[in-house]
Amino acid sequence: MKLRLAALIIIAGILFFFNLGATSLWDPDEPRQAIMAREMMDRGDYIRPYLNGVPYLEKPPFYSWMIMAAAKASGTLDEFASRAPSALAALLLVVITFLLGCRLGDERAGFLSGLVLATNYQFLSNARESVMDMTFAFFIGLSIYLAFVSLEKDKRLSFALSLIPGAFAILTKGPAGLVIPVGVIFVYLIFKRRLKRYFVPLVLGSILATAIASIWFLLAGESYIREFILHQNVTRYTNAFDHIESPFYYFHKLFFNFMPWSLFLPFALYGAWRRRYLLPLLWFVMIFLFFEFSQSKRAIYLLSAYPALALMTGLYLRDAWETLVARGWTNLLLKTLAGLFILIPVGAIVAVHVLPEADVAVFREGPKSLYVYLSILFLAGTGFLVTLFKRKQDLALSCFLFFLVFTGFFYSAYYMPLVDRTSKSLTLITDPLGEYKKTKKIYTFGFNSAGIIFYIGKPITMLRDIKEIKEDERDILLIVEEKPTMHLRETLEKSFVPVKRVKYEKDQYIFYVRKNG
């Protein structure tokens, strides 16, 4: 067990932490978290979050506290410190998934479940981003794991205490952090016919977790309670004011975001039902239904269900992989997948040399190590295909897993840093500002960007109407996005002169100063 767990921690640690600070913080969520942590430290107010100098009432401060702790440990509040809490939460959640897999099946099931969690697209991406959803998912997963272990050992006191992580989930993102694990555990107790014995500990644990979380709300004040609880949670859930999607939104999002493991998911769900793997099945169904009934929908909301999906998939692979490789039609499907794995690196190399220069210039001019990465992926895909032909079950699974792990490594070691420094980094806008960052009051018009605030290092004013600065006689700098403001160019250039133009993503940004500035 120790060997498999150590291997899993090393693999997931590399996937989540390698090059973690090599890319800039991307709008909109990442820099927002870092700004709140920095403003807390600058103000010395660790209770009330601020964003761009204004009280931020939408989320509690726990993730900001974690960023501050990481910044203290590393010595500076930078990209690594901002993302480290999310990466650590992801790593711990992989460990929890492994431990649950061992309890529900065996070490092999635990190891496969952990790898499934670490290598699906959504989880791997979010593990490397400064987003509170990963720590939110961790605390939910920790509560469910501790409750399950307590039930196995028939420990009512530890069962009640298992809900304490729900308090930190509340302080990370909201009341759903307690509602979800309590709901999952409650339904699980009904199915296991143990509700009568554990109902009181469940209630007491819920009260204790709520009391712990309430301390911050009492200290923060009525405005935070009113905005956060009533508007950001109750109203958003029942009568959404943003992120409004169709009832089928989560079905296609889950399929694409859990790739490549979503290919096995229908069989894994059926297998979990047939073999009565109740905990992960109820865990997933409860979370899916909870957010499906919400009027506000985002793909990342389902992140707390991913450990359950990984468990069901890992258990299914443990139970069915040999049959999948041995049986004719499933072996053919796996060979098709292996063929796709081979075509991906080959197609990438062809695309780099065939597509128009404007579309692939970043890769043509990038490091030549691209061809090394793609060659390794080609060999892994080929190995997967050959072992399927030879019906070598364990070797085929090893090649399959290696392909996915190395794809994740390629994503963090090559792809993301290259895309960041050529088109996605907000430093492409802020670095050319030079001394303007220090000497001028800065405004933006036509766009909002928390990233610009973070990299400038001070609050900026985001204009809704260009008339707002007509009365401001100070020495100012105005940053505008070119396309949305084309119709205002004549008006702008009556009072301002363009001093620099920079490219960010697919648009141009123009820096204006006053004609007498």
Regions found by a protein language model. Give the residues of each.
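Membrane-embedded architecture of ER/inner-membrane glycosylation machinery
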Residues: A160, G271-G517
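Membrane-integral, polyisoprenol-dependent glycosyltransferases
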Residues: M1-W329, A351, K500-R501, E505-Q508
